[in-house]
Amino acid sequence: MAFQLALDALAPTTHRDPSLHPILESTVDSIRSSIQTYPWSIPKELLPLLNSYGIPTSGLGTSHHPHAAHKTIETFLLCTHWSFQATTPSSVMFMKPSKFNKLAQVNSNFRELKNYRLHPNDSTRYPFTSPDLPVFPTIFMHDALMYYHPSQIMDLFLRKPNLERLYASLVVPPEAHLSDQSFYPKLYTYTTTRHTLHYVPEGHEAGSYNQPSDAHSWLRINSIRLGNHHLSVTILESWGPVHSLLIQRGTPPPDPSLQAPPTLMASDLFRSYQEPRLDVVSFRIPDAIELPQATFLQQPLRDRLVPRAVYNALFTYTRAVRTLRTSDPAAFVRMHSSKPDHDWVTSNAWDNLQTFALLNVPLRPNVVYHVLQSPIASLSLYLRQHWRRLTATAVPILSFLTLLQRFLPLPIPLAEVKSITAFRRELYRKKEPHHPLDVFHLQHRIRNYHSAISAVRPASPPHQKLPHALQKAALLLLRPISPLLTATPFFRSEQKSMLPNAELSWTLKRFALPWQASLVLLALSESSILLHKLFSPPTLQAQHDTYHRHLHPGSYSLQWERTPLSIPRTTAFLPFTPTTSTAPPDRSEASLPPAFASTFVPRPPPAASSPGAQPPTTTAAPPTPIEPTQRAHQNSDLALESSTSTEPPPPPIRSPDMTPSAPVLFPEINSPRRFPPQLPATPDLEPAHTPPPLSIPHQDPTDSVDPLMGSHLLHHSLPAPPTHPLPSSQLLPAPLTNDPTAIGPVLPFEELHPRRYPENTATFLTRLRSLPSNHLPQPTLNCLLSAVSDQTKVSEEHLWESLQTILPDSQLSNEETNTLGLSTEHLTALAHLYNFQATVYSDRGPILFGPSDTIKRIDITHTTGPPSHFSPGKRLLGSQPSAKGHPSDPLIRAMKSFKVSGNYLPFSEAHNHPTSISHAKNLISNMKNGFDGVLSLLDVSTGQRTGPTPKERIIQIDHYLDTNPGKTTPVVHFAGFAGCGKTYPIQQLLKTKLFKDFRVSCPTTELRTEWKTAMELHGSQSWRFNTWESSILKSSRILVIDEIYKMPRGYLDLSILADPALELVIILGDPLQGEYHSQSKDSSNHRLPSETLRLLPYIDMYCWWSYRIPQCIARLFQIHSFNAWQGVIGSVSTPHDQSPVLTNSHASSLTFNSLGYRSCTISSSQGLTFCDPAIIVLDNYTKWLSSANGLVALTRSRSGVQFMGPSSYVGGTNGSSAMFSDAFNNSLIIMDRYFPSLFPQLKLITSPLTTRGPKLNGATPSASPTHRSPNFHLPPHIPLSYDRDFVTVNSTLPDQGPETRLDTHFLPPSRLPLHFDLPPAITPPPVSTSVDPPQAKASPVYPGEFFDSLAAFFLPAHDPSTREILHKDQSSNQFPWFDRPFSLSCQPSSLISAKHAPNHDPTLLPASINKRLRFRPSDSPHQITADDVVLGLQLFHSLCRAYSRQPNSTVPFNPELFAECISLNEYAQLSSKTQSTIVANASRSDPDWRHTTVKIFAKAQHKVNDGSIFGSWKACQTLALMHDYVILVLGPVKKYQRIFDNADRPPNIYSHCGKTPNQLRDWCQEHLTHSTPKIANDYTAFDQSQHGESVVLEALKMKRLNIPSHLIQLHVHLKTNVSTQFGPLTCMRLTGEPGTYDDNTDYNLAVIYSQYDVGSCPIMVSGDDSLIDHPLPTRHDWPSVLKRLHLRFKLELTSHPLFCGYYVGPAGCIRNPLALFCKLMIAVDDDALDDRRLSYLTEFTTGHLLGESLWHLLPETHVQYQSACFDFFCRRCPRHEKMLLDDSTPALSLLERITSSPRWLTKNAMYLLPAKLRLAITSLSQTQSFPESIEVSHAESELLHYVQ
């Protein structure tokens, strides 16, 4: 610590580097050794973890490895840990020879290597297999122990009697017994499936491997015992998932301390030494706590582990806020859940944490702290708190005393009559002498009493006599009260009465209650205590203990006790019998290479019968080592295992006497396991359609995501998916054929139940019912049953039970009935059962269902929806709708009857399409001009011409459309999900004779090629397959348009109108996959309405299945796929040679094509099918992809998709693709969310059509039909005053007075945790206001100037368009004039200067970027150079010189003052904007928004000053929208600095921050002199010219005040890493960052003091503006500073200096009258004078009240404008406003009238008003938001004086 302080002191000097030289020199050797030993590039987030394991890696390696951290751990294990253990000649098992050679060079005791090929992959790792076992007494087993059972290790020790020690490395997550969630997901992930644990190192799927799920049991045993053989198991070291175990022969001797003689002392401090100790092991995990279980619920432990820091912060937060809403804990959790350090926490754990915090908010500890109390009050409090416990303890004791007389019968003295005396005179008994009670006298009386007792009861048992010890004890007890006993009646004489009197004598009698009564009393007392415990709350102590145990749980530690393991038998260590060998002689002296055994032992021949065909047996086969060499640290390729591979060897023959029992910790010993393990077979699939299995199972992408996308799947490891046959619904067994409730063949319903049915209504396939009703639950979507029940008066339950007597269960409960409801097939069955005929009124007209030979009729109405619905009764229509299509057309009839593989074509009717001439004309016009298509651009000037050119043909069609009337043509639309088989049935249809006159139009040449290949027509018929342009020039009877939505809008109309011979159009396409977009900016095709909406009514049904996509993609979309291939969703670093590459842009596609890859854009791939996995390229345009393009990319391949590029584009953040993120993270893709306006309108069918009947579905429950609201996806509006979600409202302490903090209940939940919401820590003293006596001033004399006359000729005649610019062929709009009102001049007065209006000028911000922003060359952080450090130090020294500070001195940090600054900053943030504005900007506190990212937008303003008047186009001022975290954390730092700057600032330096115009006037009058000229300066691009030196300067300023280091580091990090939507920025100043004005002012002041010897010269600074009273000499070191600065000065020597819009001088200050004159003109023409007049008047009064001296401040050219402004206010202002021009103080009532409408009141005008009026104005809702609060500025100026 002292050395660090010394280094900090030497930091500004040149002595720091020599002081650090010894330290750097001492680290060179260790760094060099680390780089040589661990040369791999380790991810930076894993480097601290490896260092905490004790691995000395520097992280400076450059070699890349797919799992570098595991490789580092393995190297440390081998070269350091094992090398230290190998003290004798040793053998090594399961290691590559090359790795063993390196290990042997490190330690020569590694003599022998034994490898065994036990898996096909071993042949690639081990060139030879060893026929024998190791020979040395020490063996090192490398990463194979997890595959061996303890019985096999015991077998190894038994086979090798000389084996003493076995060092084994074990790779298994210690938390595997909790769940599948890793504690270090960046280091490893794993999943457990049945009895297999799949381990993935660092997201590298290719390096993953499988092992038994109980391998972690090796960490739970400490010994292995078999009979008299014992092996001890010791865990030497653990590095996360890698453990080093030592298994050695024998057991350690007992601890001698356990055999020590027991001690007799109760207070033995070493008693635990004589007790056996537990063998407890623990493993390192993140710092976590375990949440309590929910009441009466069982929650997994892994879902209750949360970070301790987050829990403690959330616990404090929920009790610190004044108002807590139900959403606040969830928002607080969200802030922390996205942090990389908490990636190990499960989503359920986060949910449980926020729920636990929310529900336990009301709990508080029931404690009191009473210190200054009397003993009686303390006793009373104790009894009130613990009376239950005292009562519970005392009642049983008191009840037990009732039994004491029964079991210990003590005699009780009772009165007995001795004699009676009557009628005698009064006699007195002899008075005994009165003696003082002393000990001896009392002892005598007690002895006499004891003698009397003995005399009365001589037969008393001996134990009832009072012993002598008891007498002594009684005397000692009575000694203190002996004076009191002398006055008792026991010692007084009694007077006998004259009345008859009985003389009594006392005798001892035995008295005892019955034992039954005693037991009853005891039972009643115990029962009362029990009832009290049952119905009363816990005691205070119990409440206290439960509260702290429940809300303050201890840290969770991953530990358990290790126990011995007993095994009944051994299992063979190897699957073959090894040969015997002897140990070679010790050759440690010679450097001989290790020996390898080169004999390969073949496997035993397979059994005669297949193992799978044998029936299961009760005796399990002994285990064999499972993949013992498939280790975590080896990058093995994915091997394709063919179906002809060698069968695994049979297990070794076991002796019959072996029992099948096995250890509990390793249950795999009892389960038969084939060797080696393969993927699970799928016997229900046909072999022809079953893809060959991979050597690794499919991995969930959430467990294999590499943050840097370094993980990849090698292409050649993926087998080509099977070539699918023709689409058929019989690929998978139909549920109807396997239905156990049915019998017989599958036949149409009308054949099984013959009656007269309407045509095509009873042709659906079914089977006879064989079993009675199974009482299936009634479906939720039962509107059909309700409609039939209402008409037939049969209950819905009876109707449902009747259906279960005629239809199989598979047709009653399936996916269709669950999602679409019951259909007309069920209606037909009901009509047959109940003998009625139903007329269903649908969109197609009335349709009859049910037998025609019945007289009972019912009416049902069917609405299409969605959702569709059956309702009882007939729908009343004005006219009967006519049926669509042309049933008499032979083409359409043929299509309706055509079948492919037993399935009908998925359409209902042909729709008459009326062509639109306007659509066709739009498209042909764009084609003619070359905006859409390329035919008109083809060069046909060369070659033989046989007809018109393509362009001439297009022109002819264009002319033809001018005179051709529109026509109606039948259109059939086939729509469905990607790969549903839309194309194949149409191709089979076109092969028929009736449809031979056809042509096909395709959007791309790739799709046209697929059509040619599939149709297999003669070469002369190839003209029938065309691209969309050439198809228009040809003619046919039938037109097939494939991917209609990829055609230009209006293409269907143009195709119909261009071909008079066309009779039928068949269109194919998926409206969800997007539509055509022209690449020409001049095309007008986009102005036509979308084709998806025009063609939507033609979609009769949408095929919701796929033959293409693999199962992993189908699960995402929740769709059924007939492709049995599992597929893959992964990531690659480089594309594979055969895989197609899908890009976002044509440029990227051309690049990949030029590199030799097969590539196309995502949009152009629509309609294509790939066999290899599609590689999706992720780049900057990924986040802009539409949902349609995302759907296309994910559904192109039969094998899956692989992403290539940065993982941030699939990370689920704002800058990523939502659909790709869902796919990559294995989240369901909800189609309603991605296609909210289109998908709900599609009529889905889930299986191919097997019948052409009019089948209708009802998908609404029996209630009335519901329809989705068009805005169902929009959240409801919540008013700001909403308080029903308040969980708790904490009141302030009563002695704090009224609440001065602003409300925070309206803040977004993500922002509220950023507020400290601290009450004012310091009460400011009362401020006394002093009123300066008014001084008599001469009123100024104005020369006559008429405002209107001067304004009429002020604006020169010019063309506003000449002052605009062109940006990307678009004109700017800074001088709008069209339709703008004007009255003063010949043009609108707004043309005086440029007006910045981002809403009306789209070029404003893009055209200003190059001037206002400075970008870094890359995303890397800005590097602070040596010149930046030097210049920053020079500026800091100059700034200290300006404030008369010592650069090396520091100021102690004041926490109380900083807390007050926090309150001020939050007050300013809450009061500067309205509540609605803060709520609307909730995204500013989004936790997913990186703090270094700012959003740049243009500032809307009409700036009028000398530089902008009559100027041309001007770049806008850019504002930076930063995260609320930055504003709320760094804002107090700047306010804290401002307080000290205000206190230290010399009087000759004026800073305009927080100053009023009156203060500016007073300072000028006091300090400015009459010397001329004065130096005024402004900078060009001041903000952009600040580089790294500004960061150094700001950091040094904060260090001087001892600002906490983490805040300084945060500031430096933000400045060097800032990025925007336009790119990364340099360290430039951003308007909007905390302290922009203060830092600019300090930078400007530091530059001035670096340039001049200022001394006591008055200086004025405000941001980049400055003014020096008179010329100053230049400093000698100024040239060295100037060469490092990037500033561009605009120095001006003037006699009339202008500062912040005011002309200043010794007389005071006056507002620039020229700018004010222009503003008044603009306000008049804009008709906004009433809103702005008061503000302009208050600005004018600042100079007007100076009197005659104001003319000394103005240049002569501005006198007329000052006079014109005075004339304007005198003519246009009402009388009460003109009172401000008077020097006297106006009355408060007058000011209140003046400020009755302060909407456009400026900041300066606000400063001039009294505080009462300012508060009243700021409370108005229409008041303009000010950049800073005046009250806050006033508090800052007064704060330091009473804090210090």
From Swiss-Prot:
A GO BP entry: proteolysis
Catalytic residue positions: C783, H869
Residue positions of motif GPP flap: 865-867
Domain Alphavirus-like MT: 58-219
Domain (+)RNA virus helicase C-terminal: 1104-1236
Every OTU domain range: 728-879
Annotated protein name in UniProt: Non-structural replication polyprotein
PROSITE patterns tied to this protein: ALPHAVIRUS_MT (PS51743), PEPTIDASE_C21 (PS51738), PSRV_HELICASE (PS51657), RDRP_SSRNA_POS (PS50507)
Family listed: Belongs to the Tymoviridae non-structural replication polyprotein family.
Limits of the Peptidase C21 domain: 730-884
Protein source organism: Turnip yellow mosaic virus (isolate TYMC)
Enzyme nomenclature, EC number: 2.1.1.-, 3.4.19.12, 3.4.22.-, 3.6.4.-
Ranges annotated as biased composition (Low complexity): 609-621
Entry PTM: Specific enzymatic cleavages by the host yield mature proteins.
Record site: Cleavage: S879, Q880, A1259, T1260
UniProt binding sites for a ribonucleoside 5'-triphosphate: G976, F977, A978, G979, C980, G981, K982, T983
Residue numbers spanned by region Disordered: 571-729, 859-887
Molecular function in Gene Ontology: ATP binding; cysteine-type endopeptidase activity; mRNA methyltransferase activity; RNA binding; RNA-directed RNA polymerase activity
Keywords, ordered alphabetically: ATP-binding, Host-virus interaction, Hydrolase, Methyltransferase, Modulation of host ubiquitin pathway by viral deubiquitinase, Modulation of host ubiquitin pathway by virus, Multifunctional enzyme, Nucleotide-binding, Nucleotidyltransferase, Protease, RNA-directed RNA polymerase, Thiol protease, Transferase, Viral RNA replication
